[in-house]
UniProtKB/Swiss-Prot annotation:
Classification lineage: Eukaryota, Fungi, Dikarya, Ascomycota, Pezizomycotina
Name listed for the protein in its UniProt record: Cytosolic Fe-S cluster assembly factor NAR1
Organism: Sclerotinia sclerotiorum (strain ATCC 18683 / 1980 / Ss-1) (White mold)
Keyword Membrane in record: no
Keywords: 4Fe-4S, Iron, Iron-sulfur, Metal-binding
Gene Ontology MF annotations: 4 iron, 4 sulfur cluster binding; iron-sulfur cluster binding; metal ion binding
């Protein structure tokens, strides 16, 4: 497990935003033995040290809530750390890529030596955390990360085989694809009588994990769209394996993310090549490992690199080997982008799924407007798209944090059937005739962390050693200091808004919030045609009810069997 977890950090990562929704497990008191003939008492209320169970840390302590992770998953997730990244880079000489003689293709060398191609994807929330820590813009933080992972002054400088990441990509690219397809999914669900409404976002793995193990009745509501992390993993593995003629296990993909839950997402068996390649494959993960923003700094420290001194300018494009498909290369590494960086501030810091869906829907209804209604706290907001004549066309909402998610899930819970013959379902008597059991939303953006993804558990915190200079003397970071720090990270997240080049993609005229749906769909169609795979198998995923073994007496044999049987476990 990553060294970022220590006995000094036993609190839930979303504290003090919300209280833990699961009670602490109370262990039964030991029964006194009948063989004891003597009783010894002490004049103190303090228990003996031997009476206290040793404090232990598992992935359960880091994820969204207690009891949402099985022990088998905890083992799988604990293997992902900055140490694993360095171990992979030093395991064998990497595959060498060259332009062929004509300059129209990529040549691969070193396949027989057991090496791999290394690719990294970086989230904008992680860049924002780095930017706030070192006092730079989000874009400059991205350049520093790129120099660390693939530049001459980065980790390759002290590596055994001088391996580095061949490509460092921005997950904002696949985020745009997720926004377009997600918006179309919502619109399609409004006319499909067989679909469950509302559609709930599924890009937050903490929320998905909680739903699968605690509230399986909401699973039919989850969006089928993969997250930007997962979609990027599939895009990289499928394209490189097809274009370079190598197996997916020769491509090693690491993602830099803001929360620990993304490690769990990468371990899902639904996100392996077994899904898009078909049966009979080994189940190679689309994302091999996930490290957090904080672990990225630990990666630099492990190589003796002072992160703050890394260049804040881009690596020359002339030194980059182009991606082996021209159209996908221009998609992943656009020379000019028309948009607003990480999106409008009204979209929030979690990708803007809801914001884009509202504007996409409004763009198809001329004269309509978007109205905002604030909820009982800052993490609950209702939205409506209203026609020119005042008719409500769509209702949507944003629910962040588990305290608010609890209320949403409760409203979606189906009524219990009556035990009396001919009786109405329990709870239906309080509903007006014809009113559905759940809310009348068409779409709800759900995130586990209060404030959104910039407040993820893997982000650099105000009281971390690198930020101790911000605190005066021995003062500890309280709720107010943490709130101010999160505001700085949010500001860094949007710091790239004014720096985006003003140029369009193919000069399309169908832009919605800076994104061209036709360009996205054309690129995705090209991807499917290039790989020879059905687009639905590439961009969509599934969910299932999972029974957690946390707090249950599960033997080691059962745990080993569960891990060994997991498709994405690497066994």
């Amino acid at each position: 497990m990553s060294a970022i977890l220590s006995a000094d950090d036993l609190n839930d990562f979303i504290s003090p935003g919300v209280a833990c929704i699961k009670p602490v497990e109370t262990l039964p008191a030991a029964k006194p033995s009948a063989d004891n003939e003597l009783e010894i008492s002490f004049n103190t209320d303090a228990p003996l040290p031997s009476d206290l169970p040793p404090a232990q840390i598992s992935l359960t302590d880091c994820l969204a809530c207690s009891g949402c992770v099985t022990s088998a998953e905890a083992v799988l997730v604990s293997l992902q750390s900055h140490a694993e990244v360095l171990s992979q880079l030093d395991s064998a000489p990497g595959l060498r890529l060259y332009k062929n003689a004509t300059g129209t293709g990529i040549k691969v060398e070193g396949v027989e030596q057991g090496g791999k191609i290394y690719v990294a994807s970086v989230s904008p929330q992680s860049r924002a955390s780095i930017a706030a820590t070192f006092g730079v813009t989000e874009r400059e933080a991205g350049y520093m990360i790129e120099h660390l992972l693939s530049g001459p002054k980065g980790i390759k400088n002290r590596a055994v085989y001088r391996n580095a990441f061949q490509w460092v990509v921005d997950t904002n690219i696949t985020r745009e694809a997720c926004l377009v397809l997600g918006a179309e999914e919502v619109i399609a669900s409004m006319t499909d009588t067989g679909s469950k409404k509302p559609v709930l976002t599924s890009s937050c793995p903490g929320w998905v994990c909680y739903a699968e193990k605690t509230h399986p009745h909401v699973l039919p509501h989850l969006s089928r769209m993969k997250s930007p992390q997962a979609l990027m993993g599939t895009l990289i593995k499928t394209t490189l394996s097809r274009k370079l003629g190598i197996s997916p296990d020769r491509i090693w993909h690491v993602a830099v993310m803001p929360c620990f839950d993304k490690k769990l997402e990468a371990s899902r068996e639904e996100l392996t090549d077994a899904v898009w390649e078909g049966t009979g494959t080994r189940g190679v993960r689309d994302v091999d490992s996930v490290i957090t923003s904080k672990e990225l700094l630990m990666l630099a420290d492990s190589r003796g690199i002072e992160f703050s001194k890394l260049p804040r300018t881009p690596i020359p494009t002339s030194s980059r080997i182009p991606f082996p498909d021209t159209k996908i290369d221009s998609f992943l590494f656009p020379s000019n982008r028309k948009g607003s960086g990480n999106g409008n501030r009204d979209a929030g810091t979690s990708g803007g799924n809801l914001h884009y869906a509202l504007h996409y829907f409004a763009s198809q209804h001329k004269g309509s407007s978007i109205q905002t209604i604030k909820g009982r706290n800052v993490d609950v907001v209702d939205y409506t798209v209203v026609a020119e004549n005042g008719e409500i066309l769509l209702k949507a909402a944003r629910y962040y944090g588990f305290r608010n998610i609890q209320n949403l899930v409760r409203r979606l819970k189906p009524a219990k059937p009556s035990r009396m013959p001919g009786g109405k379902p329990i709870g239906s008597a309080r509903r007006p005739n014809g009113k559905a059991s759940g809310p009348d939303y068409s779409y709800v953006e759900v995130m586990a962390c209060p404030g959104g993804c910039t407040n993820g558990g893997g982000q650099i915190k105000v009281d971390d050693p690198i930020n101790t200079s911000r605190l005066e003397g021995d003062a500890k970071a309280g709720p107010q200091e943490q709130k101010m720090w999160l505001a700085q990270v949010d500001e860094a997240y949007f710091s790239g808004e004014d720096n985006v080049e003003s140029s369009s993609v193919d000069d399309r005229n169908d832009l919605v919030e800076g994104i061209s749906p036709s360009y996205i769909k054309d690129t995705l169609s090209h991807w499917a045609a290039t790989t020879g795979l059905d687009l639905e198998r590439l961009v969509y995923t599934t969910y299932r009810e999972v029974v957690s073994d946390v707090g249950k007496n599960v033997g080691d044999a059962e745990r080993v069997i569960e891990i060994a049987g997991k498709i994405g476990g690497g066994w």
